[in-house]
Amino acid sequence: MQLFTSFSLLAVASFASAHGIVTDISSGNDWWTLSNPFRDPYMNPVPDRVGWSFFGAGNGPVPDFTTKDIVCNQFAKPGKLSATIAAGSDLTFYWTVWPESHKGPVLTYLANCNGDCSQVQDPSTLSYFKIDHAGLEDGVWVSDKIIANNNSWTVKIPSDIAPGNYLVRHELLALHSAGQDLGAQFYPVCINFKITGSGNAKPAGVTFPGAYKRTDPGILVNIYNGIKSYIIPGPAPYVEGGSPGNSAEPQPQHTSTAVSTAKTASTSSLTTSVTITSQAPSNTANPPQSITTTTTPKPQSTNINPTSLKTVTTSLRREQLINLCLDDINRQIAAAQPKNGGPVNFSNIEKKREDCYKI
């Protein structure tokens, strides 16, 4: 029991400081908790979820977005349940605390499973059409807006979509290392849905891998040179009564729906009640009225550990050094986890995580 408790604290601490996952989703009065790679594998029995599991992947990015991992994350297995939602409804995604340095766009897709989504063994065989995206608008990254809105983002399910079983694919793309090949960091999650309604639209889609290219201007990009515009990867979102097309500037603006106070409070208590160190970012139930963005020096490496931090140039901000350190911790956590659960001793990793905050 002590091992599980220690590990749980380590996992949540890493959530609060580097990278992230979607923990919950909601629509109206309905709320669903998704699969958690740091918790669910160690529960007996392992709970059935509407979200696809990715045990062993941790909360870090997909290592190579040109592989099938880009669809639903590494080691992805279909959720055994499906959530029901009406076409035209809002759907809110609740992320763990997102690092301010991980600036980039948010993207959401739908794919018809052509049957029970829990029976889909290879999600790369499905066709995905985009229903929402947002990137850089008036100098503000959408990732900053997500942070300000208690680490949540709301999209609308198109009202004219034909009813059926759909996979919702939602992701954040972090661009802090995107100036180098394969440096863009994708954080995808897949969720099973049964969409109800009377629509008949069946938009054409794209496939993953393949929809994103290594040299796409929104993927291989230096965000530290004062860019004024940004081309979001993938196709343009489907418009009710219309059809998706190629993504090009100017990007359509996203109208975000505010998260209710009750749900915000629930998410806030989940992320703040287990914060271990004072340096870790904390969630807030009162988002700031204005958002400011800062131009920060580009991290010079994403492969670092606490013992080598003293050799890193001092031109980096302290929070960037902490992020680099925690990147390495996340990789160690993922490597230490057995794919199918089981006891693990994380004491050494916990010590290294504590050292990250002593920089």
UniProtKB/Swiss-Prot annotation:
EC number, as in UniProt: 1.14.99.56
Compartments, record wording: Secreted
Signal peptide interval: 1-18
Use case: Lignocellulose is the most abundant polymeric composite on Earth and is a recalcitrant but promising renewable substrate for industrial biotechnology applications. Together with cellobiose dehydrogenases (CDHs) an enzymatic system capable of oxidative cellulose cleavage is formed, which increases the efficiency of cellulases and put LPMOs at focus of biofuel research.
Paired cysteines (S-S): C72-C190, C113-C117
Cellular component aspect of the GO annotation: extracellular region
Gene Ontology biological process terms, A to Z: cellulose catabolic process
Residue ranges with Polar residues bias: 245-254
Keyword Disulfide bond: yes
Biased composition, class Low complexity, residue ranges: 255-304
Keywords associated with the record: Carbohydrate metabolism, Cellulose degradation, Copper, Disulfide bond, Glycoprotein, Metal-binding, Monooxygenase, Oxidoreductase, Polysaccharide degradation, Secreted, Signal
Region annotation (Disordered) ranges: 241-310
Cofactor, free-text remark: Binds 1 copper ion per subunit.
Catalysed reactions, semicolon-separated: [(1->4)-beta-D-glucosyl]n+m + reduced acceptor + O2 = 4-dehydro-beta-D-glucosyl-[(1->4)-beta-D-glucosyl]n-1 + [(1->4)-beta-D-glucosyl]m + acceptor + H2O
Binding-site positions, Cu(2+): H19, H102, Y187
Main subcellular localisation: secreted
Similarity field: Belongs to the polysaccharide monooxygenase AA9 family.
Function recorded in the entry: Lytic polysaccharide monooxygenase (LPMO) that depolymerizes crystalline and amorphous polysaccharides via the oxidation of scissile alpha- or beta-(1-4)-glycosidic bonds, yielding C1 and C4 oxidation products. Catalysis by LPMOs requires the reduction of the active-site copper from Cu(II) to Cu(I) by a reducing agent and H(2)O(2) or O(2) as a cosubstrate. Active on cellulose and on xyloglucan for deconstruction of plant biomass.
Name of this protein: AA9 family lytic polysaccharide monooxygenase B
The species this protein was found in: Geotrichum candidum
Gene: LPMO9B
